[in-house]
A protein has these predicted regions:
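Hydrophobic beta-strand segments that make up the repeating blades of beta-propeller
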Residues: 55-60, 107-111, 156-159, 205-209, ...
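Blade-level signature of beta-propeller repeat domains, shared across WD40, Kelch, NHL, RCC1
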Residues: 333-365
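Blade-edge motifs of beta-propeller repeat domains
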Residues: 19-37, 71-89, 120-138, 169-187, ...
């Protein structure tokens, strides 16, 4: 449900200038993977139950490469790694989730034009291939892992760019065969995020669409009713949903190529007014992450860019301060947050396509 009402926000937005990065620093040993790997994204979680965050890296994009599992040494460095599975894939995402409710994190693999995969954790951080799901001809770009039918088990919403999007329901044993299509065939969806926007007790889906298509919100539990979000002239590459202004209602953040990025503020009825923009009109933002970088109780924004320095935006409760970090020459496809050093502050992992993936450690104290 979209309203033309322009919501009055309690804070002002950022200026067009960027400040020097003072919060995050890289380390020569805090890199992951090969410099020539075409990494699309990464996920973080404690896969071996040793108390620190490990990292799964999705490699390949359109080209066949091997995905990797990196194990944290307890100090934020990743000196041990394993290949995921025995074959190379054209992978875009590798989210972690406990799909069988056995207490450990499993891996779901989103592949381009080959079937998607499920790897189950043996409880010790080793991953065993379990099954395929999806169609070989699908252009899968993103996965949203969330319980969509309120049965207590996570399901999978699949973003298939310019082919049919699907929901795959969990059979309560971590197997995904029962599927439901939603939206029109040919919707150019890149990413999906989820929240209960209309507060009816069911999770809804918000889609980031490319190719001149408007973004959409599909409402659960049947995902037939939808509303548009944003303009039809934007190339949206990422979407997230969080309560950015601490009013108790989740908002929607979208990032775009060749246009400013946007925050759509939600209200108690699930309406979204005209957006507040951040960044510059020539930004080429490929991905975003949301988290409290400075532990001040409100949410900040991190943007990963293609051929530009990456950015983070610090929310001080009244405005956002913008900072740049990383190399302008990098093709950054993904951004992942996690406290990799267990010091109580979030660090930033940037997934680069054609150069090494880099961890930027939070210098806050």
């Amino acid at each position: 449900m979209i309203s033309n009402f322009t919501k009055i926000i309690f804070f002002l937005f950022i200026s067009a200038s960027y400040s020097q990065n003072n919060f995050f620093k890289s380390h020569p040993y805090a890199t992951l993977g090969r410099s020539e790997a075409l990494t699309a994204s990464a996920s973080a979680g404690d896969i071996d139950s040793d108390g620190d965050l490990d990292i799964i890296v999705a490699n390949g994009r359109h080209w066949s490469e091997q995905n990797e599992v990196f194990y944290n040494d307890g100090k934020g460095f990743f000196r041990r790694s394993k290949l995921l599975g025995f074959e190379r894939n054209t992978t875009y995402q590798v989210p972690l989730a406990d799909i069988d409710n056995d207490g450990d994190l499993d891996i779901i693999v989103a592949n381009d034009r080959i079937e998607n995969q499920v790897f189950k954790n043996d409880g010790n951080g080793n991953f065993i291939f379990d099954h395929y799901f999806g169609k070989k001809e699908s252009n899968t770009r993103g996965l949203c892992i969330i319980d969509l039918n309120n049965d207590g088990y996570v399901d999978i919403a699949v973003a298939n760019r310019k082919s049919q999007n699907y929901i795959y329901y969990n059979n309560t044993k971590g197997f995904f065969s029962d599927k439901k299509q939603f939206g029109p065939h040919g919707e150019a969806t890149i990413k999906i995020a989820s929240s209960d926007f209309n507060r009816d007790g069911y999770n809804d889906l918000v889609l980031a669409n490319r190719n001149g298509q408007k973004n959409r919100i599909y409402y659960g539990p049947d995902f037939q009713k939808f509303s548009f979000l944003g303009d039809d002239n934007q190339e949206t590459r990422g979407v997230a949903t969080h309560d950015m202004n601490s009013d108790g209602f989740n908002d929607i953040i979208t990032v775009n190529i060749g246009a400013k990025n946007n925050i759509f503020f939600g209200d108690r009825n699930g309406y979204f007014g005209n957006p507040k923009s951040f960044g510059k009109s020539n930004d080429t933002t490929m991905a975003l992450a949301i988290g409290d970088l400075d532990n001040d109780g409100d949410l900040d924004i991190i943007a990963a860019n293609n051929g530009q320095k990456n950015q983070y935006y610090i929310n001080d409760g009244k405005k956002y301060r913008a900072f740049q970090f990383g190399q302008a020459s990098s093709v950054s496809y993904g951004v992942t947050l996690g406290d990799f050093t267990n010091n109580g502050f979030l660090d930033i992992l940037i997934s680069n396509s054609g150069s090494r993936n880099i961890i930027y450690f939070n210098q806050s104290k």
